[in-house]
């Protein structure tokens, strides 16, 4: 469950290390984002010579949440940390690698590039 001011790890090699959610997209009063939702983030920490810089405002998709996600069959899945993948204007990942597992709910939301780059899909 991601809301404004939530800090997230970045699960790709775009150059950002930590981002902060500044807006949840999808409705004028939408408060929370879960796995597969697109948010607007500000880069708070970045590595030198990366594709994104500290202070950049970008869109990102949430790939892991500490709040459990309930599935159709009744099972739940949760992670230790919140994580996101930074997107470009076309909705494709900026980075060329994805670190850590991602959930298969991303497949239903047509993030096939992230699914194919991820080392593990849970």
Swiss-Prot record:
Name of the protein described by the UniProt record: Large ribosomal subunit protein uL14
Keywords (A to Z) from UniProt: Ribonucleoprotein, Ribosomal protein, RNA-binding, rRNA-binding
GO CC, alphabetical: cytosolic large ribosomal subunit
One GO term of the biological process aspect: translation
MF terms (GO), sorted A to Z: large ribosomal subunit rRNA binding; structural constituent of ribosome
Top-rank taxon: Bacteria
Function recorded in the entry: Binds to 23S rRNA. Forms part of two intersubunit bridges in the 70S ribosome.
NCBIfam families with a match to the protein in the record: rplN_bact (TIGR01067)
Family: Belongs to the universal ribosomal protein uL14 family.
InterPro entries to which the protein is assigned, alphabetical: Ribosomal_uL14, Ribosomal_uL14_bac-type, Ribosomal_uL14_CS, Ribosomal_uL14_sf
PROSITE patterns to which the protein is assigned, alphabetical: RIBOSOMAL_L14 (PS00049)
Subunit organization: Part of the 50S ribosomal subunit. Forms a cluster with proteins L3 and L19. In the 70S ribosome, L14 and L19 interact and together make contacts with the 16S rRNA in bridges B5 and B8.
Gene: rplN
Tagged with keyword Metal-binding: no
Organism field: Cereibacter sphaeroides (strain ATCC 17023 / DSM 158 / JCM 6121 / CCUG 31486 / LMG 2827 / NBRC 12203 / NCIMB 8253 / ATH 2.4.1.) (Rhodobacter sphaeroides)
């Amino acid at each position: 469950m991601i809301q404004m001011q939530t800090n997230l790890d970045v699960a790709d090699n775009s150059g950002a290390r930590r981002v902060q959610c500044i807006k949840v997209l999808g409705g004028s009063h939408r408060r929370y984002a879960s796995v597969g939702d697109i948010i607007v983030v500000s880069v708070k920490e970045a590595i030198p010579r990366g594709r994104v810089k500290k202070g950049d405002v970008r869109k990102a998709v949430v790939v892991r949440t500490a709040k459990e996600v309930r599935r159709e069959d009744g099972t739940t899945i949760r992670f230790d940390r919140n994580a996101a993948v930074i997107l470009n204007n076309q909705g494709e990942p900026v980075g060329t690698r994805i670190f850590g597992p991602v959930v298969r709910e991303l497949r239903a939301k047509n993030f096939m590039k992230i699914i194919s780059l991820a080392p593990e899909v849970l």
